[in-house]
Curated annotation (Swiss-Prot):
Quaternary assembly: Homotetramer. Interacts with MPG/AAG, through inhibition of its glycosylase activity it potentially prevents formation of DNA breaks in ssDNA, ensuring that base removal primarily occurs in dsDNA. Interacts with POLDIP2. Interacts with PRIMPOL.
Superkingdom of the organism of origin: Eukaryota
Localization, UniProt: Mitochondrion; Mitochondrion matrix, Mitochondrion nucleoid
Residue stretch of the organelle transit peptide: 1-16
Entry annotated with the keyword Amino-acid biosynthesis: no
Family matches, as SUPFAM superfamilies: Nucleic acid-binding proteins
Boundaries of every SSB domain copy: 30-141
Modified sites of kind Phosphoserine: S67, S79
Main function: Binds preferentially and cooperatively to pyrimidine rich single-stranded DNA (ss-DNA). In vitro, required to maintain the copy number of mitochondrial DNA (mtDNA) and plays a crucial role during mtDNA replication by stimulating the activity of the replisome components POLG and TWNK at the replication fork. Promotes the activity of the gamma complex polymerase POLG, largely by organizing the template DNA and eliminating secondary structures to favor ss-DNA conformations that facilitate POLG activity. In addition it is able to promote the 5'-3' unwinding activity of the mtDNA helicase TWNK.
Primary residence: mitochondrion
Claim: Mitochondrion is one of the keywords in the record: yes
Protein name, as recorded: Single-stranded DNA-binding protein, mitochondrial
Gene Ontology CC: one annotated term: mitochondrial nucleoid
Length: 148
C-alpha cells in the first residue's frame, strides 16, 4: 500500500547515471532546519563589499524538562535551556521584509538550512560561525500588539 508512493518519492531524490557510463550513484541530501522561538534583537542589515546585503538577527529557542526519577517525575524541578541561533536572510524579498518587520521579542517560525562558515575578525584571526540561512519566516505574533 505505502510501498509505491515511497518508491516514487525516493526516485525523486536518487538519480542514476547510465550503467554503461558509470556505476556512480548521485544522490541528494537534506539540510533542513525548523525553528520556533522569540527574536533576541532587532535585525541589522549588513553588506560586505562585492556581496549582496544580508539581514541578521538572533532567535532564542527553549527546551524544558523535569528532573527526578519515575516516582517523582511529575513533581520534579523544571529545568530550562535556551539556545541562541544566528539567522541570516539573503533572499532579496524576504531579507527586506525581515529587516522591516522582525522585532525584538516577536515570536516567529523560521525554515532554512545550517551553514558553517569561516571569517577573519578585525584582528585577522580566523573564526568559525554557524548560522541558519532562512528560506521562510512566519510571523506568529506582533510584539507591539502584545504590549498594548
Amino acid at each position: 500500500m505505502f510501498r509505491r508512493p515511497a518508491l516514487q518519492v525516493l526516485r525523486q531524490f536518487v538519480r542514476h547515471e547510465s550503467e554503461i557510463a558509470s556505476s556512480l550513484v548521485l544522490e541528494r541530501s537534506l539540510n533542513r532546519v525548523q525553528l520556533l522561538g522569540r527574536v533576541g534583537q532587532d535585525p541589522v542589515m549588513r553588506q560586505v563589499e562585492g556581496k549582496n546585503p544580508v539581514t541578521i538577527f538572533s532567535l532564542a529557542t527553549n527546551e524544558m524538562w523535569r528532573s527526578g526519577d519515575n516516582e517523582t517525575y511529575q513533581m520534579g524541578d523544571v529545568s530550562q535551556k535556551t539556545t541562541w541561533h544566528r539567522i541570516s536572510v539573503f533572499r532579496p524579498g524576504l531579507r527586506d521584509v525581515a529587516y522591516q518587520y522582525v522585532k525584538k521579542g516577536s515570536r516567529i517560525y523560521v525554515e532554512g538550512k545550517v551553514d558553517y562558515g569561516e571569517y577573519m575578525d578585525k584582528n585577522n584571526v580566523r573564526r568559525q560561525a554557524t548560522t541558519i540561512i532562512a528560506d521562510n519566516i512566519v510571523f506568529l505574533s506582533d510584539q507591539t500588539k502584545e504590549k498594548a
